[in-house]
């Protein structure tokens, strides 16, 4: 900033003139008095020196070139299946799933998830208000990890027409979503991305990154993925030298079903350092089992991942079964209820 001052070169005195009569003389014989001419007297009165006036003069601000800073590591998306152009982080952008290629013009503010697993992922990536609606079981604290958020959110039924009425900008579906439902959404022009929900936490990392890219939440997707990987590494380090118990995940509705290979429950058992006893016995997916089948599997631990009311009845049945009395899980009291939201 340059400063210009406005100051007079010299300070000048103020001059006041006062009339002051001189002494007069009386002359004898005069018939009157002759008054002398007044003489001007000069009086100098000091004045204060003027104060400098500061006048700011605008100058141009220096222009500094700033390189754009990436808010996230773009290379994390390079090998993610489904991203059509992994170098494009602008809009529009395209992704390809089993339902084909969809193009999203801008960060979607109205997203609809048809599965609980997907809405739980989205809740970790975007503001919940960007999700158009939830279903009743999303608000069940026994089944859902977003129950509190869902309780105060718009709730709809299972009629696909209700979803269409929401006018979502994109719909996220799982591989289990009814094909007719997906077809209806696509027929009215709503983009649908069908992404897989894997059976393991680490297996879901690519899915999380794909969804994050799709909705413009790349940094959040990386942060969530990093947290999952760090937690799984911690568990792996802790369990490195531990013995691996044979764990059976079994639940009962009208019949009992064991979770074998390829199941979510089985994946959790293995990541927690156990052996999936059902898979170890040749069971794939979820298969019906009898009390005798459970005895043959001979697990060290039994977990029952279903709503508490039904779980308590089934656990009592397992504990009281004569057929199961000698298997390690029953004999050692290693039968546990697991809230459905945890798998």
Residue ranges and their predicted role:
Residues 1-119, 219-249:
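Bacterial Sec-exported substrate-binding components of ABC uptake systems
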Residues 84, 94, 101, 180-257, ...:
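Extracytoplasmic substrate-binding proteins
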Residues 177-187, 304-319:
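A ligand-binding cleft/hinge motif common to bilobed small-molecule-binding domains
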